[in-house]
Amino acid sequence: GPAALIEAASRPVDCVMAAIVGAAGLRPTFAAARAARRVALANKECLVSAGTVFMSAIKEAGAELLPVDSEHSAVHQSIADTDPRFIERIVLTGSGGPFRTWSAEQMAAATPEQAARHPNFSMGRKITVDSATLMNKCLELIEAFHLFPVAVDQLSVVVHPQQIVHGFVEFTDGSVIAQMGTPDMRTPIASSLAWPARMSAPATRLDLVRLGSLTFEAPDEQRFPALGLARRTLELGGTAGAILNAANEDAVDAFLERQIPFPAIAALAGAALEEGVRTGRVCEPACLDDVIAADEEGRALARGLLRRYS
């Protein structure tokens, strides 16, 4: 059970990979941060919901934090030991999801089955729906803000359907360093386990000649409003991330159960965040318990808004 996970994560080991999905991963990952020399982080909630508290725990313990998500791993590798003063901007890439070329009218009628078809990766249903709404990029921008020494306005997203370039960093001299590879999670996992060395991984090797060309485009925030929620959440700070993340999880569940239409996912998550602001629920967390309480409040706000669709 949960107590056993926390006990296992608390053991003094060289590296812990934190890959428990959802808020259930918060306490074990915090325990790992206090005990491990290195935490390979694949749990979004630790940074999205508990960013400042979690990073404080990492710093206090003197632990090393390495990102496992392909986009953040790409940025980490691109920055390496660069002086933060020379970083001009960080760009995360994304496939654009299964509805990249769909009109707003088409997306309004999208089914859970259609939303669950990621163009490049095989993932769980919730994560794939986040990719369809671009909420995954919203959450990744929030994570990047906590992981890397940049301001909010130095972070952006581009749509890259082939998902060969996973992220890139532009420096003050105009040069850009990017990390490339086939869309295979074994590569960033291997990087986080071996860094700064490299280990052999069975990922498919990249053949640029066979690919021929790579394309990039700006995301359409009119059709994908979830992306704009990252800026709002970071402007608010505090427990805003916990409320947004929890509300989104409940909204995705409601969509998968056919209770709400696809466009309502981002709308409901955003509305829950603003209701949290209006009712004074967004505050600065002092500890992990405050974050978990905010997660519960976000779910309660989402449930209240969901009643409008019943």
What is the role of each PLM region?
Residues 1-310:
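Catalytic, metal-anchored helix/loop core of enzyme active sites in primary metabolism
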